[in-house]
Design a protein with these regions (language model features):
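Short amphipathic alpha-helix used as the core "switch/output" element in two-component signaling
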Residues: 39, 61-73
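Active-site residues of response regulator receiver
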Residues: 52, 79
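Acidic catalytic/metal-coordinating carboxylates
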Residues: 33, 59-62
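The feature encodes the CheY-like receiver
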Residues: 56, 83
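Acidic, metal-coordinating helix/loop segments flanking the phosphotransfer/catalytic sites
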Residues: 5, 30-48, 66
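Short, conserved "switch-loop" micro-motifs in signal-transduction and mechanochemical regulators
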Residues: 70, 81-82
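Conserved acidic carboxylate
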Residues: 8, 55
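Two-component/phosphorelay signaling modules centered on CheY-like receiver
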Residues: 10-29
Length: 83
């Protein structure tokens, strides 16, 4: 089964994505922080990461750099930033 990790601090966005992805028969895990997201990515090894760039505990670009040190898993980036 294809697995997806959602790294997003907004509960409603996580919920929306989870419902949509599970509706497509994907297995979904989530994390509210970048730190937790890296832990989940390392332990669960998802097929795809959906990442919010603007989380309170850091910069999503740093998450990508950290992840790329040991994985080439695909990442879809989300952002509500206007800058």
């Amino acid at each position: 089964m294809t697995t997806v990790l959602i790294v997003e601090d907004e509960k409603e966005i996580r919920r929306f994505l989870r419902i949509a992805l599970e509706g497509e028969s994907l297995r979904v895990f989530d994390a509210e922080t970048l730190q937790r997201g890296l832990i989940e990515a390392a332990t669960r090894k998802p097929d795809l990461v959906i990442l919010d760039l603007g989380l309170p505990d850091g910069d999503g670009v740093e998450f990508i750099r950290d992840l790329r040190q040991w994985s080439a898993m695909p990442i879809v980036v989300l952002s509500a930033r206007s800058d």
